[in-house]
Amino acid sequence: MISEQLEIIIQKAFELAKNKKHEFLTLEHLLLELCNDEEVKKFFSYKGINVKFIIEDLTAYIEKKLKSIVAKEDVKPIPSMSFERVLKRAAQHVQSSRKGEVKTLNILVAMFSERDSFAVYFLEK
């Protein structure tokens, strides 16, 4: 089960991808929306990470580099394989630790296993 806040963030990421006419819902869409979450912002602040730079990098990436996944017609974005893996990994972690529901920080941590994603690149930059 996922938290209500995470559901909202996933929906916003979906809407972002849909508004951009992207065929796929990517980790970059998700991370951009996660950057607006209060818990994630607190975590970044605690770690000395400037969320503004992550948002700027992600926005530029989505605008310029995701043109290859723009559909010719309106489509419902499909979650990418990496998006699905992150959700599954976070859910498995929460289930194995008996912590209840998947929250935004669980997703953020699970993203780090996707070493080849630009989302992780921007987080580590």
Describe the function of each predicted region.
Residues 1-125:
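Histone-fold recognition with a strong bias for associated Lys/Arg-rich disordered tails
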